[in-house]
Amino acid sequence: MRLVSPTIVRLGVKSIFGRWRGVLLFVLPLVLVGLAVLARALVGQSEEGSQHTLYGLGLVVVVPLVALLATSGLLAPEIDDGSISYLLAKPVPRSTIVLSKLVVAVACVLAFASVPMLLAGLVLRTDDPSVAVGFALGSVLGGTAYCALFALLSVVTRHAVVVGLVYLLVWEGLLGGLLDGVRWLSITRWSAEVADRVAGLTLVAQLPLTYALAAGVVVI
């Protein structure tokens, strides 16, 4: 029994890039890398500037949005046109369907979030490549966890994009900035802790790396 179905993977890719979501998936990394180039030209190799760009824009905005766009486009077309019932009626385990869809979403995160994060980090801090590597690895953990969370939303509601945006704005954004304890239940903060440890930064205070990794694995 295959854990991943190539046919379902192809359908997943088509459902993402055959709609407006595919355009946004290309725009977001271009914005990140473009702003990194601009910041480098204006302020040089600034530690503060690189953190604002890679964390404030990359981990907080680009990574979760890429994951949301990728996962919301995987099941929505089948649910909207009713073909999901035919897909579920096929002699394919549901676990294979879910894993195949998640593979597509995670691949999108790697291609449109993690790789651009690495490139942006190298542009901003050529003197310290560990910064780029740290944020890229953090985006892998965070992006994969977001894919798992948003995939669940796409199954339970047809308004996964709206619910996902509310979650990002309220929990990860508003409450995450106001309440210090939210870091223990924040995917973005778990990602930042990985970047902290690899690059020697202090984006998130008093959050053990083992907890961040374990929490991410639990969500996935």
Language-model features and meaning:
Residues L30-P77, D81, V98-V162, V166-Y167, ...:
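Secretory targeting signals
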Residues M1-F26:
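Aromatic- and glycine-rich beta-strand/loop motifs that create alpha-glucan
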Residues V163-G173, R189-D196:
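Membrane-spanning alpha-helical segments of multipass transporters and channels
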